[in-house]
């Protein structure tokens, strides 16, 4: 099994990150708007993106947003994105990315990490439960 290398994402990774997000959402997005948003997020000190590489190829990423929540009176690390390309699933890439984000949040003083995932993503639900997460809330959304 090839070694999994983790590293921070940079503006030079925009195309690779775009491909990962398209895989996650099973959709394509306006590439220019994505580039603008991704580069803005890279400048935000509370946003952290890390990539996973196998044999030099980007195969996964995680996005961590550090936020002070008033209802916790503490910092929380929100996992906003976690995606692994199909060819790299089952190789512990997701677990390594998640462990990185948890340690990053811990080092930043966060009391917990949290995330949401689509109700249809049963494999993701099993993954997060296996990684020690528990289902504790319902999330509601409304298109505007």
UniProtKB/Swiss-Prot annotation:
One of its GO terms (biological process) is aminophosphonate metabolic process. Its EC number is 2.3.1.280, 2.3.1.-. Residues 4-144 form the N-acetyltransferase domain. Pfam families: Acetyltransf_1 (PF00583). It catalyses: aminomethylphosphonate + acetyl-CoA = 2-N-acetamidomethylphosphonate + CoA; (S)-1-aminoethylphosphonate + acetyl-CoA = [(1S)-1-acetamidoethyl]phosphonate + CoA; L-lysyl-[protein] + acetyl-CoA = N(6)-acetyl-L-lysyl-[protein] + CoA + H(+). InterPro entries: Acyl_CoA_acyltransferase (IPR016181), Bact_Acetyltransf (IPR050832), GNAT_dom (IPR000182). Disruption phenotype: Cells lacking this gene have lost the ability to utilize aminomethylphosphonate or (S)-1-aminoethylphosphonate as the sole source of phosphate for growth, but are still able to utilize the other aminoalkylphosphonates 2-aminoethyl- and 3-aminopropylphosphonate, and alkylphosphonates. They are also much more susceptible to the bacteriocidal effect of (S)-1-aminoethylphosphonate, even with phosphate or D-alanine present. Its cofactor is a divalent metal cation. Keywords: Acyltransferase, Transferase. PROSITE patterns: GNAT. GO terms for molecular function: N-acetyltransferase activity; protein-lysine-acetyltransferase activity. The keyword RNA-binding does not apply. Homodimer. Aminoalkylphosphonate N-acetyltransferase which is able to acetylate a range of aminoalkylphosphonic acids, including aminomethylphosphonate, (S)-1-aminoethylphosphonate and 2-aminoethyl- and 3-aminopropylphosphonate, using acetyl-CoA as acetyl donor. Is required for the utilization of aminomethylphosphonate and (S)-1-aminoethylphosphonate as a phosphate source via the C-P lyase pathway. Is also essential for the detoxification of (S)-1-aminoethylphosphonate, a structural analog of D-alanine that has bacteriocidal properties due to inhibition of cell wall synthesis. The sequence shown is that of strains K12 and B. This is Aminoalkylphosphonate N-acetyltransferase. It comes from Escherichia coli (strain K12). The gene is phnO.
